[in-house]
A protein has these predicted regions:
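Active-site beta-loop-alpha junctions enriched in small/polar residues
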Residues: 232
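Conserved metal-phosphate-binding beta-hairpin within the catalytic cores
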Residues: 229
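Catalytic and binding regions of secreted/periplasmic enzymes and modules that target cell-wall glycans
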Residues: 226
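Extracytoplasmic cell-surface/polysaccharide-interacting catalytic and binding patches
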Residues: 1-105, 109-223, 236-294
């Protein structure tokens, strides 16, 4: 997405890209709103290490060595009963000549909160909104609405904090090159939605093939991100129309005891409106984004 300073010439299909991005963001907002209506009763199931499970198997799987937003350590854990499914996916990919790479797993409430506030992330959201509006400073209401989708500002939207989601990439076993999905993890643009029409045909097919292998073992794709898959949470049960109460809600996890405790209130935003307003003012100043008419 272009920035105000040193902005490249608009692409011939710039308006179409903006239109799709807005459509996608509103679609995601509606999906997450519907997710809130899905009944959830935390079952208390503990977590298991994905890396330990892989080490005890014959599956070749990789793990990200980067940090979240620069300095937050990743936690490669997921609900215990989901481990066999991930191993099966990894084995299927190995048989195809691929390697599944886990980019992210469980996130604590603190991690999810900090992620949404870090300048590296928040500035990207602000810049994307500025681009969406054709070069106008975004309102706080738009930033709040987009943050709900892009960084799960409400706990009952965050499947990572439920211990039910993984972010993934895929690589070739023979030479270690990435299986292209249009852009590498992590991307925030009109290429991010799983069904983006602005991704080349080969990358679109790779997205489809990876999703088919993930969903064969129950890990459903999130339409808003080509790397995100989840199972057993409210979004999963809503999409599959299971008719069941979701057993996984956002939880605090004690790694020493492997005990989980449900959040007290999943409907309160991690970053409240007044603080988000302050962050927006800081970001606009930091980025130098002003109306074209000024």
């Amino acid at each position: 997405m272009p920035t105000q300073e040193g902005q490249p010439a608009p692409r011939p299909d710039e308006d179409a890209r903006r239109e799709f991005w807005t459509f996608h963001m509103e679609r995601s907002a509606e999906l997450l709103h519907a997710m809130q209506q899905q009944p959830t009763e935390e079952c208390g199931e503990g977590f298991a290490s994905i890396a330990d499970a892989v080490a005890a198997s014959d599956v070749e799987m990789w793990f990200s060595d980067s940090k979240i937003a620069g300095d937050l350590d990743r936690i490669f854990y997921i609900r215990e009963t989901l481990i066999p499914d991930l191993l099966a996916i990894g084995a299927d990919m190995n048989a195809r000549g691929w390697i599944l790479k886990i980019e992210d797993g469980y996130r604590t409430k603190q991690m999810q909160t900090e992620l949404g506030r870090k300048p590296a992330v928040f500035d990207t959201i602000v810049r994307s909104c500025w681009w969406e509006l054709g070069g106008e400073p975004p309102s706080l209401e738009l930033i709040r609405r987009r943050s709900t989708c892009l960084v799960a500002n409400f706990p009952n939207h965050g499947t990572h904090t439920m211990g039910a989601a993984v972010d993934v990439s895929v690589f070739l076993r023979d030479d270690g090159t990435e299986v292209s999905r249009g852009k590498p993890y992590l991307e925030m643009s009109e290429l991010t939605p799983m069904d983006s029409p602005f991704v080349r045909t080969e990358a679109q097919q790779n997205r489809i093939d990876i999703t088919t292998m993930m969903e064969a073992h129950g890990f459903l794709h999130y339409p808003g991100e080509f790397w995100h898959y989840n199972k057993g949470d409210a979004l999963y049960h809503m999409v599959t129309k299971s008719g069941q109460v979701s057993p996984y809600g956002p939880v605090h996890w004690d790694q020493a005891t492997n005990k989980v405790v449900a959040y007290d209130d999943v409907s309160l935003p991690l970053t409240p409106p007044e603080l988000m307003g302050e962050l927006l003012d800081q970001a606009l100043t930091r980025l130098g984004l002003q109306s074209d008419s000024q």
